[in-house]
Curated annotation (Swiss-Prot):
Source species of the chain: Streptococcus dysgalactiae subsp. equisimilis
Gene Ontology CC: cytoplasm
Any one Gene Ontology molecular-function term assigned to this protein's record: glucan 1,6-alpha-glucosidase activity
NCBIfam families registered for this protein in UniProt: PRK10933.1 (NF008183)
Pfam families in UniProt: Alpha-amylase, DUF3459
Xref: PANTHER family: ALPHA-AMYLASE FAMILY MEMBER, NEUTRAL AND BASIC AMINO ACID TRANSPORT PROTEIN RBAT
Keywords, sorted A to Z: Cytoplasm, Glycosidase, Hydrolase
Protein name: Glucan 1,6-alpha-glucosidase
Signal peptide location: none
Gene3D superfamilies: Glycosidases, Golgi alpha-mannosidase II, Oligo-1,6-glucosidase, Domain 2
Primary gene name: dexB
Localization per record: Cytoplasm
């Protein structure tokens, strides 16, 4: 396998609205990110994935783009973007841009022209039909919106302000490739591709994900844009199996560097239920099965995976699967150790490295997220009690990840000097903040720093094979074999003591959140114990 820089990289996702505000308007901005690069350099990350900062009416917080080659005023301007790129590159940090090309904003010049002039070339940049079919929007309701002026319907798999692009139109594809090359020329390190598995859709057959021409489009995109540059690409692919992931990321296929697979995320809700019908606790045996499948079936050289617990669309893993009260620090370290010692490129979402938690939303006035608000409206119309709706939003709503970054004990957690922030700051910022984390050598931050450094330094993390070890249900233990070297990772994914009887005598500790000798002596794991050891030959 040809080694690439991203095999040893750890990537840090920034949600710009919530990272750091320097303008005093209560919303994070590009200058705020630049001001905190030294912090990220200390953490040790290789690259930042930047959620969208393009010009946008912000119907879906920037995932509705009205101009791909301009910066949203709320975040700054192109000079600020250039400054961020230069300052990051000086520190050896790459910037990965979010590429949102399944749809645009309805305020994009192409759609404005398409709507105003049904005979324009731009009309065919989007998907119009005389009659709607049964396709549903991911944000609830029909995926078709009537344009009263022409009497036709346009397709929007997300909000009605996010019309889907017609990827069958070669002119659209070329315009997208030109835009991608504009950003590559600026020196970015790659693209994270939003819902990229939807671009091959065939609406008339009600096929949305993994359409028949999807891989043709990606091969064409690769050749026309990033294929000749040392940049990384990761596709958001909700429906991916290991077999599909191989198609995307097998090097000789010349498509993407890696994918995000979301199979484990499905464990956040009850089987075959919507996300709002959340599971009360993590099914650890199911998690073991899913992670082990991806570790063993996406073989080295055949494709590449990403590793993540959190992103801007998901609740905080600490609150949904960890223990965000008495074992907050320990369970955060345990979940990090469990994930980061697998094969793949790990992604950290802002605040994860200090153990940020879900927000205690009281009522809908505190909620901003379009998906949560649509769910609340629909659920309450169907008789779901308001208390149950709020319980679901508190547990799995997207705003949990989007509350402002907690920098210090200062007002608004040091995020902003505004009177009010765009989303409320979690009241636990007095206990959970960057300043305290940096001052405490035993904090979650330093466990993440250690894991990031290990990945840069240790070839086995990239190349060793993976084998799940038989254990109690709530213990996740796996072994990685690299030539003569054997590494064993053991994590108690529970609040209860667990038996662990494997003989690891004489093993060398690589990383831990507990007293490994005591575990091996007593053959018991305390709640959320986690460690990695190298076995003696």
């Amino acid at each position: 396998m040809q080694k690439q820089w991203w095999h040893k990289a750890t990537i840090y996702q920034i949600y710009p609205r919530s990272f750091k505000d320097t303008s005093g308007n209560g919303i994070g901005d590009l200058k705020g990110i630049t001001s905190q690069l030294d912090y990220l350099q200390k953490l040790g990350i290789t690259a930042i994935w930047l959620s969208p900062v393009y010009q946008s009416p912000m119907d879906d917080n920037g995932y509705d783009i009205s101009d791909y080659e301009a910066i949203a005023e709320v975040f700054g301007n192109m000079d600020d973007m250039d400054d961020l790129l230069a300052a990051a590159n000086e520190r050896g940090i790459k910037i990965i841009m979010d590429l949102v090309v399944n749809h645009t904003s309805d305020e994009h010049a192409w759609f404005v022209e398409a709507r105003e002039n049904p005979n324009s070339p731009e009309r065919d940049y989007y998907i119009w039909r005389d009659e709607p079919n049964n396709l549903m929007s991911i944000f609830s309701g029909s995926a078709w919106e009537l344009d009263e002026a022409s009497g036709q319907y346009y397709l929007h798999l997300f909000s009605k302000k996010q019309p889907d692009l017609n990827w069958e139109n070669a002119h659209v594809r070329q315009k997208i490739y030109d835009m991608m090359n504009f950003w590559i020329a600026k020196g970015i390190g790659g693209f994270r591709m939003d819902v990229i598995d939807l671009i091959g859709k065939i609406p008339d057959s009600e096929i949305t994900g993994n359409g028949p021409r999807l891989h043709d489009y990606l091969k064409e995109m690769n050749q026309a844009t990033f294929g000749n540059h040392d940049v990384m690409t990761v596709g958001e692919t909700w429906g991916a199996t290991p077999e599909i992931a191989r198609q995307y990321s097998r090097p000789e296929n010349k498509e993407l560097s890696m994918v995000f697979q979301f199979e484990h995320v499905g464990l956040q809700h009850k089987p075959n239920a919507p996300k709002w019908d959340y599971a009360e606790e993590l099914d650890v045996p199911a998690l073991k099965t899913i992670f082990s499948k991806w570790q063993t079936e996406l073989k080295l050289g055949e494709g590449w995976n990403s590793l993540f617990w959190n992103n801007h669309d998901l609740p905080r893993v600490l609150s949904i699967w960890g223990n965000d009260s008495i074992y907050r620090e320990k369970s955060a370290k345990a979940l990090a150790i469990l994930l980061h010692l697998m094969r793949g490129t790990p992604y950290i979402y802002q605040g994860e490295e200090i153990g940020m938690t879900n927000y205690p939303f009281k009522d809908l006035t505190e909620v901003d997220d379009i998906e949560s608000l649509n769910y609340a409206k629909e659920a309450m119309e169907n008789g779901v009690p308001a208390a149950r709706v709020m319980s679901s939003i508190r547990k799995v709503g997207r705003d949990n990840a989007r509350t402002p970054m907690q920098w210090s004990k200062d007002t608004h957690a040091g995020f902003s000097e505004a009177q009010e922030t765009w989303l409320p700051v979690n009241p636990n910022y007095q206990e959970i903040n960057v300043a305290d984390a940096l001052a405490n050598q035993d904090s979650i931050f330093y466990t993440y720093q250690q894991l990031i450094a290990l990945r840069k330094d240790q070839d086995w993390l990239v190349e060793a094979d993976y084998h799940l070890l038989p254990t109690a249900d709530k213990v996740f233990a796996y072994q990685r074999q690299f030539g003569e070297e054997t590494y064993v990772i053991v994590v108690n994914v529970s609040d209860q003591e667990q038996v662990f009887a494997k003989d690891l005598a004489g093993a060398e500790v690589v990383i831990t959140n507990t007293d490994v000798d005591k575990v091996l002596e007593t053959k018991h794991l305390q709640p959320w114990d986690a460690f990695c050891v190298k076995l003696s030959v």
